[in-house]
Structures are given as structure tokens and as C-alpha cells.
Amino acid sequence: MHFKEISPIETVNKLKGILKACEIEVDETWLQKSSLNTYTVRIEIKGTGIGTNGKGISKDFALASGYAEFFERFQNNMLGTNVIVSDKVDEHGGALDGKCLTAEELIANNNSFMRLYFENRNMGNASFQDKVQNFKSVHVLEHLLNNEDTYYSLPFYNFKDGKVEFLPINSYVLNYGSNGMCAGNTSEEAIVQGLSEIIERYIQKRLFTEKPALPDIPEEYIKQFPYIYEMFLLLKENSSYKVMLKDCSFGGKYPVAALIIIEKNTGKYGIKLGCHPDYGIAMERAFTEATQGQDIFEYVNRSVIDFFNTNVEDETNICNSYKIGVGQFPYQLFGRTPSFEFAPVKDVSTMTNAEIANSWINEFINDGYDVLVRNVSHFNFPSFHIIIPGMSEMRNTSDTLFRVYNTKHLVSGLLYNADKITLDNTKYIIGTMDYFSNAQLENIVSNFYSYLEDVKIPFEELGEGCPYLTAMCYIVNKDYLNALREITYIENRIIHRKIDVNVLNWITSIKYYLSAMCELKDHQKALQYLESMFDKEYILRLDSLFDDPASVIIKQYPSSAQLENLKDNENYKRFEHAFHQYICAQKKNPINQEDIAKLIEFNSDKVTYD
């Protein structure tokens, strides 16, 4: 049963029933079965493209995975971008059970999250007033939104102290993202899933920072799990690749396994970790995650060996590895002498999810961590967000990062009102696009909008929306040299792809137009020279787009009127309906976070996993 309390089909039927009762329609889209006979399905709110992926060793398990993750994100209000509505509640991320606290109140609470916040700034011993001043100077978004110096904070239950604590949402979301969000058939099953994700990413970060040489998982040990061994042997049949299963348990403490696939003679490889208290399931997850949305051998395109360890410890590199598996891992992982010996993790085959959840929480507390859990099961499907300060951070946020996100909010407002983009404020767009240029899933212009439908962002489909917008901002400033640099960057990235030749010709014509403007500084003269090099259709487009540099963005990006009209589109209404169902569910089924301790039967005096 994979430590599932009910069968996967029962889970799917239950969740489909909840969606039907809420009149939320979803689409199921199956991807091609992988060469390992694993399955991937996409669950989306009908017509919107917004949803989650499911994966598994059978179609039933993949469906259950997809629907469970859908509810995990849905109940945590992390399902796509937030709809812009008039209610002030949207400014608080949609959660109704929070409270507005002053900086003084947050700092006086002195919980583990706030302590870590100031320790990361070398302000652990700073005066109370200095901490207040620092917090206010960095967290200005709330003031911009509400014209108030208060910070909307959500309740979490602290298992160590046995009480509810409030964390400022705009602070902790940047630290933790969706890490530790979980769902399951029971509260205990969900908690085990959430803790497994936290441990997996904690170990993944240790691979970057400690750079251990990993021991092999012995083949005799893998044979204890026949379906894992079968997949392992199937992969090894392909002589073009080398396949390894590595132990990441750090001496048997953490049930984490790594699947490494190397494309021979190229330097390319991929690493995928999996975690679960049952080590067979941990290995299985490494396989199924690596096949999500692709054949498993395509996973080698995630990393290349680099003996300089360039950017290995960079926060963006580590975050990218969490999000989509793309990242530069330290070459030391491939060392022949392991940093620790393989040691089997504890056998949990006779334990229940309740016992595992209880003992894991005890273990974290014994290691000196606080375990903070927020129950969001408003649709009566157990879902939570677990935060372990000092362990579950996706990144350690600096004051600079918070200020960048403040600026991102400003840039979003400018893009919603493109006619207000001027010489004076393009610098904010340029700086923000540059900051996120290497951040996977964040280097997308459409992320600066709420839900978009039938609106095309130039070069977004090719993954080049950010550098293109940056180039247009430089053109507004008549800085043709920097605009040329961005357009040349785009051309170099797309020239070898299988794309419409007209698209490539268009970006090339822009490149030569900009190079002409660098020298000639005259729009008409530049076009005259290019007339002998490009077809008339490209010359006409260049003339129409660039005759007035100040209007190049207005001509290409959606206007505020277009964006407002999107609210009349059927698919926008579907997403808005889902969001309002989430609001209604909170009102109908409010949750007292103090009840979490009863839900998972936590007993601080009883340790069953030693």
C-alpha cells in the first residue's frame, strides 16, 4: 500500500467528489508512459493551464499523486498565481485566519522563525529597537498595499512549545515556498509526506555545501525491493548511459537515496533524490520524479561536470535544483572514496504513519529544531504546511532579496499599466529582470501578471520573455548597445532550436537594426541599409515597432483595458470560481491550529523510531 491508508483509486474518487461538489471542473492529461513503465498525469483547472503533476508506478498511483498534490496546493493557496479581486483578503494571500501584527509584536514573540531571521542578518544580539527598525525598513510591501505598518501573519502550531505562533506570511513564503506543504488520506500520512520532502531538500542542500563523496547502495540491498531492482537493471541495459543508486543517508540517519544517470563521454548527468522512511519508496521516488514529464534518459540534461564548482553554492543554483532538478552539483559527489559508509536506514515496515510521524517530530525536536505545522484542511482532505526553522528553508533570504520582491511588485504594477512605463522607471524593470534571469520558474514575464489568457507576451513561449522585455526597456532609453546585447543573447540561444524560421528571421532583423542604430543613430537610415538585406515584411515591422522608441512596450504588451477584459473570459472565471470556493471553504470549515496535536496523536514522551 506504499504507506497509503486507502487505495489510490479511493483517494481519487474522494477528491473528484469534493471538486464536483464545488463545481470545479478539471482536465486530466496523460503524458507518454516512460521507458521504465512509470506514468505522469497533469491535473488542471479546466481550460486554465493551472494545476499540478502526478507520477507513479501505475496509473492509479499517478492519478492519486496528481489529485493529492492539487489539493495540497489548492488548500495552501499556492495553486498558480492569485486572481486579482477587489477583496482586501487577496492582499493577504487569501488566508482568513491570520492577524495583522506590528513589527514590535512580531519581534516580541521571539519565535524560532523570527530568531533565525535576525541571526541570518548577524543581528541576533541587536537591540529590540534596532530589530524593529530593520524589519520595517525591509518589509515595505504591506505598507504599499494597505497603507498600514502591520504585517499579516498566519498561525502555526509549535510542537516543541505546545502553542500556536504567528509568522508573517510575506516573510516566511520567501524562505520556504511550498517546501513542507503536504496532503494525504490521513493527517499522519500527510505529515510523513511533508517531513519527507523537507528531509530530501535538507540533504540536497548538504550535498552542495558539504560536497560528500556518496557511497553506492549495494546491489544486494536493492534486490530486497524487486520492482526497484527491475527498473535499475532496465536502465543499465542502455550502454550509452551509466546508472548509479547512491546512499544519501549520512550514515543511516536520513532515508534519502539518489538516482544518478550519466550520459557517457559527454560530461552530462542528472541527479534526483527521493526520501521516505521506507527506503524502497525513497528509491522509487527518485525514479518516478526523474521520469516526470519526460523519458528518464532525458534527465541527463540537468547538469554537467564542472571541476571548478562554478556557482555550486549559489542560492539560485540550489533553488533551481529544488524546483526542476537543474543545477551544478559539486564534482566531489563522484569521488571514489565515500565520505561515509553505506548504512541501512531503520526498517519501518511494521510501523504505522502515526508512529512514524510521532517519532520523526520527536527526533527533530531532540536535534534542537522547532516543528511548526499549519493545518489547511478546509475541504476535509488532510493538508498542511510544515516549517522547521533552520532546516526547511528553500533559501536564506537577505534584505536585498526582500527589496527585490518589493520592486517586483512595483514592476507588476507597471506592466499592468504599460502606458505608464517611462524613461524614469524602466530601470526597475531592467534590474528586476536581470535579478531573476537565472532563477528557474521566476524568469518568466507572465509571472508578473495574475492569470493570463489569450494574451501573448513576446518570446515568452521560447523562454526568452525576460531578456526581450529588458531589450525593449533599453530601447525606450535609446540605449541601443545594451538592447543589442540582449537581442544577440536571445538569437544565440534560439538559433539551433527547431522554431519557425520567421521568428528567427525577426529576431535577427532586430539585431541588425539595433547594431545600425548604435552607429547611425537614425531610424530611417538604418532601415534604408537593411532594405537590401531583409524582405519588405521585416522592414515594415521594424519601422512600425521602432519609429517611436518611447512606445515600443505599449505596442507589444497587453494594455490595462485588455487585462481588465480578461475577467470576462470563461477560463478566467473558472479560476476565479475556484479561488472563491477556497474562501468559502475556510468560512464553512474554520480550523483551530491547536487541534493539530490531537490530530496526529503526538506524544512527546514516546519515541518509537530510534
Map each language-model feature to its residues:
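Helix-biased "structured C-terminal domain" signature
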Residues: 1-610
